[in-house]
Amino acid sequence: MTLSFITRWCDELPETYTALSPTPLNKARLIWHNAELANTLSIPSSLFKNGAGVWGGETLLPGMSPLAQVYSGHQFGVWAGQLGDGRGILLGEQQLADGTTMDWHLKGAGLTPYSRMGDGRAVLRSTIRESLASEAMHYLGIPTTRALSIVSSDSPVYRETVEPGAMLMRVAPSHLRFGHFEHFYYRREPEKVRQLADFAIRHYWSHLADDEDKYRLWFSDVVARTASLIAQWQTVGFAHGVMNTDNMSLLGLTLDYGPFGFLDDYEPGFICNHSDHQGRYSFDNQPAVALWNLQRLAQTLSPFVAVDALNEALDSYQQVLLTHYGQRMRQKLGFMTEQKEDNALLNELFSLMARERSDYTRTFRMLSLTEQHSAASPLRDEFIDRAAFDDWFARYRRRLQQDEVSDIERQQLMQSVNPALVLRNWLAQRAIEAAEKGDMTELHRLHEALRNPFSDRDDDYVSRPPDWGKRLEVSCSS
């Protein structure tokens, strides 16, 4: 089957990119590919049998028109000016059978005009982390970019140490970022900001294209998508680590996995990025940061969208976020209805977990085993202050009994939203260290496990992290 690529970005937004081809690595080799995703995208298996090929930037497929995008952004709350694809190249936009499209973006593809002081490369460590994280999030049901392939090489890349160079093929319906809009707003080119908005609406919000109120409705949906995404992050204990405006997806996807982390111990102020000295991107600050980023996007639209309309959309953010968050947390607790004491029960559980540094994922998974008419709970053994837990658990059981559903029905609901497995940093690190020694077994094994996060397991993937795996420091270096 021949893959079809179109050139919408290239044709319609000529001032937003530089056309260039990838720079291949030395002795590149394909070490992993996503067969399930490839099948979904109708990619012939033969493409994965011819060496690094397109996955390593050595060849292009017919119809591809590679380019590096330019954008700007606020980093850690400070205007950083022009940024752009410093090591990534958009190879093309695949036209799928249903009429939708999928960007093929090759990360680590070499120097671009936007590399600044960088070398245009990615290392094996970071490409493995992103591949694992994006697939983990996908199977958790959270909107995200996807990983299609990893290529390793003999090319040395210099970071804190010398690491093997690598490339990641990332796919997504669009790589439109808040930073694309900021770039032209701060260059005082509002007509180009409007072109970007029209492009987005035409291709991703086409049902609004002929609406005279399209910009307000479109921005309101961007706000809603962002609020929903952040609510989902918070419910699974995911910290992004570097929520700069240039890392914010217009479509509400999780984008640019760097120093991310899933909660081990429940620590509301968890900081996963060791460069985040002020805690701007701490776990509990993510909802506020996302709103701040949306405000920056709204500012770029103010030359052609009424400020009152923008503010009305921004004002809806909190309610949308709380609605999504509340619904999912009630499901995690096994509540079939909404009762006035629900928030108090959740907050008291969080307080108990924070005091005892309870494991976030294990706590909710074990809570899924609760039988409403039994005072016994396997979760009790996870707490030191048994009296405090017993007091909370007694009130929790009384609340469960109000819903009048069977234990089996409730447990099935809870186990469908409380994962047994998340991508803890130590699991990723173990796969990385093996891969750097040439053993890809753990990389493939972990990828396979992450496809079923809600299934019970009896291996160390669902155990508490070992001592060496706690508080692993992760930086933006990639």
From Swiss-Prot:
ATP binds at residues 84, 86-87, 107, 119-120, 170, 177, 256. It is an enzyme of class 2 (transferase). The active site is at residue 246. Its cofactor is Mg(2+); Mn(2+). Mg(2+) binds at residues 247, 256. Pfam families: SelO (PF02696). Keywords: ATP-binding, Magnesium, Manganese, Metal-binding, Nucleotide-binding, Nucleotidyltransferase, Transferase. Belongs to the SELO family. PANTHER family: PROTEIN ADENYLYLTRANSFERASE SELO, MITOCHONDRIAL. HAMAP family: YdiU_SelO. This is Protein nucleotidyltransferase YdiU.
